[in-house]
């Protein structure tokens, strides 16, 4: 199921778009406030963001900029601003498409299909700018490839695959080292430290959070 976040302060318009997208079998969340929308965009994974520009508290350009720093997920801007420099600004801030209001809903649906088609089909996870390419067995941050051992890679991947879900040390041990492993659970802590040290130069070490007494989670 494709998950879409709409950040739009015109509630009637947002609701109309939501109904149309739901009819097309998309899952939709709506926020009418810029700050709340940004918080949601950065805390929950989506497949597409639809942003208005003129929003309370934080404008759409700033939301677009901050999302683009964290992920390559498609962004479509919908706005009444029709000047060329507004369109250029939106695209320069990282938007994939820009639609001027009022628009026909069929055009929006077509543009959504188009940007989603451009997304690669390969097995790639994007966690706050940490790009994990399973096919290529490669991890990059800000364009720089991380030199990881197989165990470090497997550990990072299993955390990323279970993003926002706290994993117990025993669960991690089973996934990375195997069910019949005689490795102690404190080895998980050691490898988490290795990973954080390699992410630290890119200020990404805090992406892996410790849940005291339980285990770890990546957000």
Curated annotation (Swiss-Prot):
PROSITE patterns: OMPR_PHOB, RESPONSE_REGULATORY. InterPro entries: CheY-like_superfamily (IPR011006), OmpR/PhoB-type_DNA-bd (IPR001867), Sig_transdc_resp-reg_C-effctor (IPR016032), Sig_transdc_resp-reg_receiver (IPR001789), WalR-like (IPR039420), WH-like_DNA-bd_sf (IPR036388). The keyword Transcription regulation applies. GO terms for molecular function: phosphorelay response regulator activity; transcription cis-regulatory region binding. The keyword Transcription applies. Keywords: Cytoplasm, DNA-binding, Phosphoprotein, Transcription, Transcription regulation, Two-component regulatory system. Transmembrane segments: none annotated. Member of the two-component regulatory system ArlS/ArlR. This is Response regulator ArlR.
């Amino acid at each position: 199921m494709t998950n879409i976040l709409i950040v739009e302060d015109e509630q009637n318009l947002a609701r109309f778009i939501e109904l149309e997208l739901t009819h097309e079998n998309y899952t939709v969340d709506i926020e009418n406030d810029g700050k709340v929308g940004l918080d949601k965009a950065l805390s929950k994974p989506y497949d597409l963001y639809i942003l208005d520009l003129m929003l309370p508290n934080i404008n759409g350009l700033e939301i677009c900029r901050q999302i683009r720093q964290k992920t390559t997920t498609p962004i479509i801007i919908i706005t009444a601003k029709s000047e060329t420099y507004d369109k250029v600004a939106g695209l320069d801030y990282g938007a994939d498409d820009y639609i001027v209001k009022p628009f026909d809903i069929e055009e929006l649906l077509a543009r959504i299909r188009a940007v989603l088609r451009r997304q690669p089909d390969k097995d790639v996870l994007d966690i706050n700018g940490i790009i994990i390419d399973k096919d290529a067995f490669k991890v990059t941050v800000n364009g720089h490839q991380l030199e990881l051992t197989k165990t470090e890679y497997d550990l990072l991947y299993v955390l990323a695959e279970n993003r926002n879900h706290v994993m117990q040390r025993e669960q991690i041990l089973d996934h990375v080292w195997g069910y019949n492993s005689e490795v102690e659970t404190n080895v998980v802590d050691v490898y988490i430290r290795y990973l954080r040290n390699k992410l630290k130069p890119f200020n990404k070490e805090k992406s892996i959070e410790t849940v005291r007494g339980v285990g770890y989670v990546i957000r």
